[in-house]
UniProtKB/Swiss-Prot annotation:
GO terms for biological process: DNA recombination; double-strand break repair. It holds the Pfam family RecO_C. This is DNA repair protein RecO. Involved in DNA repair and RecF pathway recombination. The gene is recO. Keywords: DNA damage, DNA recombination, DNA repair. InterPro entries: ARFGAP/RecO, DNA_rep/recomb_RecO_N, NA-bd_OB-fold, RecO, RecO_C. It comes from Hamiltonella defensa subsp. Acyrthosiphon pisum (strain 5AT). One of its GO terms (cellular component) is bacterial nucleoid. Belongs to the RecO family.
Length: 234
């Protein structure tokens, strides 16, 4: 029996039989786990209303199999208020985590980066792109794929703002011709290292880099959430 309560968020939920749910979770202390919530879809179930994505939860469970059994659930607060483009962005973040996180690994720091991302999306006024790019870069680091934006791997020397560099997967940035369509300027890399996405040029560079860096880990299966907000060009 797992007696402890854990702060958790639901990344994805799906029906199981007529009355139960399978929940894919990000938890503070135990990383990504899967639970079965028995009876959660029954008409009088108290669980039905708050076993939803973006609702901060306290959960406890039991079992030794890959899919645990939910034993208790309490909402910590109401759901993080996400609508429109910001809701689609949250679904994208959830799908990234479901696809990329290995189960039962401690991702405690990532849990708080995820919470920060949701809060940033909830408070954003115009665009979700800054919050998404910061989270994608943090996710790469937590997965062990962090990138040194400030040095050329060929020489070990600091990148030069006026020069052009190309990213080599799991290696780093190498010198590249100025007209390289896949290149990044040293200035852009310096901005990415700071997480400083204050202008559209840097935001576009950040988006291009995270797409390149995440693609090998996501494989060929497309993200379902991207089809929801393709019209927003995220």
């Amino acid at each position: 029996m797992h007696h402890h309560w854990h702060r958790s968020f639901i990344l994805h939920r799906r029906s199981y039989s007529e009355t139960s749910l399978i929940l894919d979770l990000l938890t503070e202390n135990e990383g990504r786990i899967s639970l079965i919530a028995k009876g959660a879809l029954r008409p009088r179930s108290a669980l039905k209303g708050y076993l939803q994505p973006f609702t901060p939860l306290l959960l406890r469970w039991s079992g030794k199999s890959a899919i645990k059994t939910l034993c208790g659930a309490e909402p910590i607060s109401i759901a993080v208020p996400l609508t429109g483009i910001f809701l689609y962005s949250g679904l994208y973040v959830n799908e990234l985590l479901s696809r990329l996180l290995l189960p039962n690994i401690d991702y405690r720091a990532l849990f708080f980066d995820y919470l920060d991302c949701l809060e940033a999306l909830a408070s954003a006024q115009d665009t979700s792109e800054r919050a998404l790019r910061r989270f994608e870069l943090a996710l790469l680091t937590h997965l062990g794929y962090g990138v040194d934006f400030l040095h050329c791997v060929e020489t070990g020397e600091p990148v030069v703002a006026q020069m052009t560099y190309r990213y080599q997967h799991e290696i780093g940035f190498i010198r590249s011709p100025e007209d390289d369509s896949l290149g990044f300027t040293g200035h852009q890399l310096q901005s990415l290292a700071k997480g400083a996405f204050y202008d559209q040029e840097t935001l576009k560079a950040a988006k291009r880099f995270t797409r390149i860096a995440l693609k090998p880990h996501l494989g060929h299966r497309p993200l379902n959430s991207r089809s929801l907000f393709r019209k927003f060009n995220l």
